[in-house]
Design a protein with these regions (language model features):
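ABC ATPase NBD Q-loop/coupling interface
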Residues: 51, 64-79
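A short, flexible loop at the N-terminus of ABC-type nucleotide-binding domains that lies
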Residues: 1-4, 8-21, 53-58, 76
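Conserved ABC ATPase signature
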Residues: 138-142
C-alpha cells in the first residue's frame, strides 16, 4: 500500500503552494490518474514521491510518503529506485548510455540478480515494447517515440512495487499506445501500484482513482 499524507509543496519565490494537505492511499493493483491543466502540479507530485523534490530540486516540502510501511522521505534517490520506477516526460533526461542493452541493464546491476535473470528481464521488457531489434542501437539514433518506449522498458525491467508515469503515451501513436496499455493492465493484474499523469482518456480508463490537481 502507498500512503501519501498531508503533502505540502511551495517553490522558492512563490507565495502560493502548488498543493497543501494532499492525502491519498493506493492499494496493490490500483492506478491513480492525475489530471488537470499544465502547471497544476502533476509532475511536481511525481517528483516529490520519487525524491527529486526536495533532494535535487529545492523547495519547501513536507508530508509523509509511506510505501508498504517504509518511509520513503529519508531514503536517497539512488536507493529509492529499488522501490519505485519513474518515467519522466522527456526521455532524454533518462538516457545516458551508448547502447540500448546497457541502458536497460543499468537499473538491474545493483538489484542482486544473476546475469541470467538480468538478461531474461531485459528480453521480456524489450519484447513488451517492440525494441528487441534495437539492442545494439545507440539510443541517440532512436526516434522520440522509441526513446519513450525505451524508458518504459527500463521501468518495466526494474519490477518495482510502485510506478510513476509522466505522460507515457506522448509522442506515441497506434500500436505503441496499445503496447503501453497492455503493459499497464499487466502491471495492475500483478499487484503493482501506478500513479500516472496522462492526457489520453483511453489509458485513463484503467484508473481506479482520479486526482484532479487543477481544482
Amino acid at each position: 500500500m502507498l500512503k501519501v499524507q498531508n503533502l505540502y509543496l511551495c517553490y522558492p519565490g512563490q507565495s502560493e503552494p502548488i498543493f497543501q494537505n494532499l492525502t491519498f492511499e493506493l492499494k496493490e493493483g490500483e492506478l491513480l490518474w492525475l489530471t488537470g491543466p499544465n502547471g497544476c502540479g502533476k509532475t511536481s507530485l511525481l517528483n516529490c514521491i520519487s525524491g527529486i523534490i526536495p533532494q535535487r530540486i529545492k523547495a519547501e516540502f513536507r508530508g509523509d510518503i509511506i510505501l508498504n510501511d517504509l518511509d520513503l522521505n529519508p531514503i536517497p534517490i539512488n536507493e529509492r529506485f529499488r522501490y519505485l520506477a519513474y518515467q519522466m516526460s522527456d526521455p532524454d533526461n533518462q538516457i545516458f548510455f551508448p547502447r540500448v542493452e546497457k541502458e536497460l541493464s543499468f537499473a538491474l546491476e545493483n538489484a542482486g540478480l544473476t546475469i541470467k535473470e538480468m538478461k531474461e528481464r531485459i528480453i521480456r521488457a524489450t519484447e513488451d515494447f517492440g525494441l528487441q531489434d534495437f539492442w545494439e542501437t545507440e539510443p541517440g539514433k532512436l526516434s522520440l517515440g522509441q526513446k519513450k518506449l525505451l524508458v518504459l522498458a527500463f521501468c518495466s525491467a526494474q519490477d518495482t512495487p510502485l510506478y510513476l508515469l509522466d505522460e507515457p503515451t506522448s509522442a506515441l501513436s497506434g500500436e505503441s499506445i496499445l503496447k503501453v496499455k497492455n503493459w499497464l493492465e499487466n502491471l495492475l493484474s500483478n499487484g503493482k501500484i501506478v500513479i500516472m499523469a496522462e492526457h489520453n482518456p483511453d489509458l485513463g480508463s484503467l484508473a481506479t482513482q482520479i486526482l484532479d490537481l487543477g481544482k
